Amino acid sequence: MTKLSLLPLLTLASAVLAKQDAFQAKCASFGRKIKLPNVHVNFVEYVPGGTNLTLPDNDVTCGASSQVVSADMCRVAMAVDTSKSSQITLEAWFPREYTGRFLSTGNGGLSGCIQYYDLAYTAGLGFATVGANNGHNGTSGKPFYQHPEVIEDFAYRSIHTGVVVGKQLTKMFYKEGFDKSYYLGCSTGGRQGFKSIQKYPNDFDGVVAGAPAFNFVNLISWSIHFYSITGSNTSDTYLSPESWKVVHDEIVRQCDEIDGAKDGIIEDTDLCQPVIETIICKPGASDKTNCITGAQAKTVRNVLSPFYGVNGTLLYPRMQPGSELFASSVVYNGQPFRYSTDWYRYVVYNNPDWDATKWTVEDAAVALAQNPYNIQTWDADISSFQKAGGKVLTYHGMQDQLISSDNSKLYYARVAEEMGLGPEELDDFYRFFPVSGMAHCTGGDGAYGIGNGLRTYNGAEPENNVLMAMVQWVEKGIAPEFIRGAKFSNGVGSSVEYTRKHCRYPRRNVYKGPGNYSDENAWECV
């Protein structure tokens, strides 16, 4: 190759390098330009793609000391005052390969943890992305104690503040600003997405809200009420994880083939009404490893029953069958659920010594009457969001061990009734996808890889990625008829055993054939 023929390549390389240098230079000087009310910049740094970013200030309970980032980006870390006695920690990640889209991430549990994995995921897809710590640090509810401003941040203010500041910074950093704004969150993040829809309908064009923790106060009470059913691990009513496996296997035996295929996955839990008495140990049985006692059978029946309040009002629907193996270690483990204990101690009763083992349904009434800052997130009239042109795509794993997928079905029904809209009308702006074989936000026995985060990624194509499906809906008007999930052989990044199209509610998946259950085209939404 002659020197002359090298010139175009050198020119191209120089242009690329200049673009990179210009981006780095813009990032280096950006902090000096930020002069927004109540915003205190901690640092601004350029982070090249491939960096394993260390997070020394991340609370140890958040469980993340580092995060690999895939895209070149400008990282802005700041604190934002939300009142005279409260503030949020906020980060904005601005990718060099920017698509003109703004996005806010959410949180989980009671946590004050920036979800760096979601920042990395969405920045890698070209979104200008923000994430906040919800107004406190760590996963404990203790920061709520005698600090109503912190509770208010957690209830709604952290997300909205991050959106307002994040949009301003995005317009400052990119001369083109942004065209559309999105939200991605699951669990508490799902609740935050719906809170934005209900309270700030103009914040987002598209909201992807998974396994939403709305009906929040009753969810807190429902989660702790399992202890009153199971008792401690020395109680006759307690089931060990091994016993729960016996229960789970029997539920799958009874309900698996209702959808037409024997694949270990329950496609529609509404049709599953298991009879647990079938596995009560026979009198005098010497081998009790594959059966349970009558007292334990009553426990299972109560666990799989709706949760009612003191006056007989439904507070929370049943735990959906099929989640037993995942739930046995977190809510059926013979201890009061930790997040619920914290909420009652530090919010409801302002008493760090409150004894969670003494909880009764009367306590649920006290908590619901309190409902600070309407954290319930249970408003069924979302017409303002509809009128603003917003779209919401919500999904919920039907093996969810922490938040019953039946609660998402209940909210869907409440919206339909409150707004007087049937499924066809709701489909214009609100689509709900139950995901068979998916546990809480990720994991599970089935095709849970829907692209709602790094741990479920199976490609960026809209048909394989729930976030990009939302982008296509907002920007091209192509609404998702299904969301495709991938069944991984050994977690994300491993081989895909099969894919399945998860149906839009209220449709359900039925195996029609021909072909194996692993063929997604052998299934039909009816």
Curated annotation (Swiss-Prot):
One GO process term, biological-process aspect: xylan catabolic process
Protein name stated in the entry: Probable feruloyl esterase B-2
GO cellular component, one term: extracellular region
Reaction catalyzed: feruloyl-polysaccharide + H2O = ferulate + polysaccharide
Chief site of localization: secreted
Protein species of origin: Aspergillus fumigatus (strain CBS 144.89 / FGSC A1163 / CEA10) (Neosartorya fumigata)
Top-level division of the source organism's lineage: Eukaryota
Keyword vocabulary terms for this entry: Calcium, Carbohydrate metabolism, Disulfide bond, Glycoprotein, Hydrolase, Metal-binding, Polysaccharide degradation, Secreted, Serine esterase, Signal, Xylan degradation
InterPro entries xref list: AB_hydrolase_fold (IPR029058), Tannase/feruloyl_esterase (IPR011118)
Residue positions of the active site: S187 (acyl-ester intermediate), D400 (charge relay system), H440 (charge relay system)
